[in-house]
């Protein structure tokens, strides 16, 4: 029950003094009307202000000006800014350089201008766009503590470029995995259809689908979070599920399925990759004559050996191609998953955790996962160069400023590799076993040699294997 003063009115000032300002109100004059102190013009006001201003300042950061509670900022020191700026600049420059090498190599080297490499060029262009149009603005924003300084209009443009380029890179990786799978499982029919027009249609579809994800925020379905300090993609539940599913989860599922199919084909090929032994020679097919072994059915045996070697080379070629495709695609899928999975898991969960108005995730966590995803654009050119000898040779020539005769070098390198494969047996132990058996069973024959022998008296000459009865005689010695 509320207290009243002597005049019958509630003692509001006493309640304010005792409950709202219990510490400051001690020792102040009575604020009630009966106390004679004017609550407005009394001398307590300066004293109250001095007491309040003398209190310790809070240790937490002041809330931002916007009502949404966005705009968390980090104040870096000078050393931290130098270290972070150097790392981000290095990532950006290496991404630009690596993807420029890919584009220049495929466009200007005749041997690399193949339809299958058009997808690699599209991937390099998407990654290059990320490095040129996205990374610099994110770097500046991070160095000043997370505050967006480029305005409201450019925020929407920046988000559209970021989403489109990153999605195009991810979807191109997905299409490359499908291309590799079809090339392995349909080696006779797919290369016929794999022409420039088909590749151009696939690339155009990838970029159009990537652009479609950026359209909803621009046309009013889901507005981006955009004010004086924050530039964040829309946190609408429906748009978040749609964009993350199309940009990441569906392509990742397709890539994992393609890798599993190629890996299964490689395992199946390895299980069937039996190296047939050389035909056994039965005892009744060998005739010992004068200590020299002669082999029957020589023509049939040589034909069998030739067929076995051809079958061997074909099996090994298929097996190596499948193994290389499985290894390459496995590394690509692994790097892609490690780089982008944390970011998209966070992006999917953020609206359900923080709501649709802003982000409550610590800024350093968001930026770490974001730059980890951007790093995928950096490593893609080096992954393909590691597994492609022609790209490695072209990179080396371009970095050494040896621009002339690159096509001739690639042709010579390819011819040298083909000669090495032709001279080197695919399975040395198999060919050695066959050749050794042939040498042991059928030694090389030599023509007869004529010699003059001298004997006295008559005796049996073991070399000629006959009885010599004359003083001189020309004898033909057979092997």
From Swiss-Prot:
Effect seen on changing residue 344 to A: Decreased G-protein coupled receptor activity in response to serotonin
Q: How does it sit in the membrane?
A: Multi-pass membrane protein
Protein keywords: Cell membrane, Disulfide bond, G-protein coupled receptor, Glycoprotein, Lipoprotein, Membrane, Palmitate, Receptor, Transducer, Transmembrane, Transmembrane helix
From the record, give the cysteines joined by S-S bonds: 155-231
Q: GO CC annotation: what is one?
A: cilium
Q: Name one Pfam family in it.
A: 7tm_1
The similarity comment for this entry is:
Belongs to the G-protein coupled receptor 1 family.
Write down what this protein is called.
Answer: 5-hydroxytryptamine receptor 7
What lineage is this protein's organism placed in?
A: Eukaryota, Metazoa, Chordata, Craniata, Vertebrata
